[in-house]
């Protein structure tokens, strides 16, 4: 009898926990994805803050020349970063217990792997939580689909690119100047500016910004006035009201006369689908481009491709970009190698003795 009561008590306790996790009445929805998301994102955030402030220098290139990234070791907010895991570790899974000591783990950049892997799990679970809440509320799943674009971008630079290059040391540093360094080196090694998928991503981001600004300004300029001229137009509305707050026909007419008729939408659903799809598809393409360049399927290279009838090179902007790429490549990791591979004219001598 006692065992039966205990089983019922535990079952009801588990049932109450399940109801609480999946309840849409909570101020913040938890969800089953949230059960994983909360600890992983808290871990990533906590380790990031501690490491950004106090982590010792990391031997990123695996050549016993550690690079400082934390505030206590001479950096500021702009120059500081979580330095990627050492090239000596490569793609090995490197938790704290795999190192001989905590000092060794810090020296080899263990915090970077810890942060990136927990962050990746966290953002994937956040995307799943968006779908889960939409499902509970009877909504369509497109919010999670839109969020998949930044998830794909983060996955590309933090996971796919290091896997393709063979080491977490090639991942993007977690800091402002570290991000810029990653971008410059990426251009030098992969000519990303000449990759069509990057061009689509630029069109997606800048186009999305332009369309959002146009949409917001058109909506706020075509509000349906519910007040007198002596009162603010904002006083005529309440949050969540069923009636429309702006006149899409007026906005459509204005924009159609400003550009041409078919440049504007007269259907609200089509308009908002376009506003969502344009930047999302652009960022999807950028993430796909990073993922292909991770395996050295690089941007277009027109190096010395234009010649005259005598065989002399006619320099183009593409040649100038290539020269800039070579200059950037010889500047980075200057002590890890003597020359970049594409500047070496002969094979390296044997070191077997």
Curated annotation (Swiss-Prot):
Modified residues (N-acetylthreonine): 2
Cell compartments where the protein resides: Plastid, Chloroplast thylakoid membrane
Catalyses which reaction(s): 2 a plastoquinone + 4 hnu + 2 H2O = 2 a plastoquinol + O2
Entry keyword set: Acetylation, Calcium, Chlorophyll, Chloroplast, Chromophore, Electron transport, Herbicide resistance, Iron, Magnesium, Manganese, Membrane, Metal-binding, Oxidoreductase, Phosphoprotein, Photosynthesis, Photosystem II, Plastid, Thylakoid, Transmembrane, Transmembrane helix, Transport
Primary enzyme class: oxidoreductase
Residues annotated for a quinone binding in this entry: 215, 264-265
Residues the entry annotates as binding chlorophyll a ChlzD1: 118
Membrane association type: Multi-pass membrane protein
UniProt PTM: Tyr-161 forms a radical intermediate that is referred to as redox-active TyrZ, YZ or Y-Z.
Gene Ontology biological-process annotations: photosynthetic electron transport in photosystem II; response to herbicide
UniProt propeptide residues: 345-353
Top-level lineage group: Eukaryota
Modified residues (Phosphothreonine): 2
Residues the record lists as binding chlorophyll a PD1: 198
Main location: plastid
GO molecular function, one term: chlorophyll binding
One Pfam family matching this protein: Photo_RC
One annotated Gene Ontology cellular component of this protein: photosystem II
Annotated site location: Stabilizes free radical intermediate: 190
Record family assignment: Belongs to the reaction center PufL/M/PsbA/D family.
Additional information: 2 of the reaction center chlorophylls (ChlD1 and ChlD2) are entirely coordinated by water.
Reported function: Photosystem II (PSII) is a light-driven water:plastoquinone oxidoreductase that uses light energy to abstract electrons from H(2)O, generating O(2) and a proton gradient subsequently used for ATP formation. It consists of a core antenna complex that captures photons, and an electron transfer chain that converts photonic excitation into a charge separation. The D1/D2 (PsbA/PsbD) reaction center heterodimer binds P680, the primary electron donor of PSII as well as several subsequent electron acceptors.
Protein name: Photosystem II protein D1
């Amino acid at each position: 009898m006692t065992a039966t009561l205990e089983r019922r008590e535990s079952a009801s306790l588990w049932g109450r926990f399940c109801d609480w996790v999946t309840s849409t009445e909570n101020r913040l929805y938890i969800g089953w994805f949230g059960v994983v998301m909360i600890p992983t994102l808290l871990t990533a955030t906590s380790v990031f803050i501690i490491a950004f402030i106090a982590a010792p220098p990391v031997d990123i290139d695996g050549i016993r020349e550690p690079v400082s990234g934390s505030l206590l070791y001479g950096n500021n907010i702009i120059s500081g970063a979580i330095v990627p895991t050492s090239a000596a570790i490569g793609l090995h899974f490197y938790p704290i217990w795999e190192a001989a000591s905590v000092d060794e783990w810090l020296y080899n950049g263990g915090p970077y792997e810890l942060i990136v892997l927990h962050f990746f799990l966290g953002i994937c679970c956040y995307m799943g939580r968006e779908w889960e809440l939409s499902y509970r509320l009877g909504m369509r799943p497109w919010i999670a689909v839109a969020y998949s674009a930044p998830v794909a971008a983060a996955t590309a630079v933090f996971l796919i690119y290091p896997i393709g290059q063979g080491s977490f040391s090639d991942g993007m540093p977690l800091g402002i100047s570290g991000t810029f360094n990653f971008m410059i080196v990426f251009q030098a090694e992969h000519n990303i500016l000449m990759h069509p998928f990057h061009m689509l991503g630029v069109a997606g981001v800048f186009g999305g910004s332009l369309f959002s600004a146009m949409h917001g300004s058109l909506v706020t300029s075509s509000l349906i006035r519910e007040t007198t001229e002596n009162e603010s137009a904002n006083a005529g509305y309440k949050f969540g009201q069923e009636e429309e707050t702006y006149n899409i026909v007026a906005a459509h007419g204005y924009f159609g006369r400003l550009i041409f008729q078919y440049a504007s939408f007269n259907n609200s659903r089509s308009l908002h689908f376009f506003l969502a799809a344009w930047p999302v598809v652009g960022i999807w393409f950028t993430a796909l481009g990073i993922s292909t360049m991770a395996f050295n399927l690089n941007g277009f290279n027109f190096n010395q491709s234009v010649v005259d009838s005598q065989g002399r090179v006619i320099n183009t902007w593409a040649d100038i970009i290539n020269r800039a790429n070579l200059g950037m490549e010889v500047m980075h990791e200057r002590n890890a190698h003597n020359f970049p591979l594409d500047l070496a004219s002969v094979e390296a001598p044997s070191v077997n003795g």
